[in-house]
């Protein structure tokens, strides 16, 4: 399936009412803090971008923060997350937006790895990540609070070499 047409842009104040108040079974720990990040001045900062569909409607947001796997800057990776409004789910926008943000990181930073994780029961997001080029790497036991209990998550990652053009 080809990627849906999607644009990623800095968040605007007018976006926030559309992005607050998540309607998803995977968020029961309190109000979403979507838009809490200032618009990033650089991809190197933690932040979020608004996901806009082909018709110009705000569909959700994709955000990121940094994780270190070693003591030096070369050992860090970006951890991304996505939230889509219910009426925009199941149309390929999540896959396209996550693929696009990975491309932005690999084009504009020296990062070698981009990660994402999701609830073990969120099969739709697992498919979206796999469609965006991510590889399932493992189970994160008891990593996420949901539905009154700690739940398992699934870790995904994509490496720069995974998306390199093949000869």
Model regions and ranges:
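Active-site rim helix/loop that mediates acceptor-substrate recognition in acyltransferases
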Residues: 27-54
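Acyl-donor (CoA/ACP) binding surface of acyl/acetyltransferases
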Residues: 1-25, 48, 52-167
């Amino acid at each position: 399936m080809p990627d849906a047409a999607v644009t990623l842009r800095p968040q605007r104040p007018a976006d926030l009412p559309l992005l607050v108040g998540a309607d998803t079974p995977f968020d029961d720990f309190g109000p979403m803090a979507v838009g809490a990040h200032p618009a990033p001045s650089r991809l190197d900062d933690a932040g979020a971008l608004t996901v806009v569909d082909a018709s110009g409607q705000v569909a959700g947001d994709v955000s990121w923060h940094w994780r270190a796997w070693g003591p030096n800057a070369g050992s860090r990776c970006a951890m991304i997350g996505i939230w889509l409004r219910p009426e925009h789910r199941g149309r390929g926008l999540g896959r396209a937006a996550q693929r696009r943000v990975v491309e932005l990181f690999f084009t504009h930073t020296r990062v070698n790895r981009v990660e994402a994780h999701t609830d073990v029961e969120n099969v739709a997001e697992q498919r979206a990540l796999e469609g965006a080029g991510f590889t399932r790497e493992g189970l994160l036991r008891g990593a996420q609070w949901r539905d009154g209990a700690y739940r398992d998550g699934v870790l995904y990652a994509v490496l720069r070499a995974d998306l390199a053009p093949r000869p």
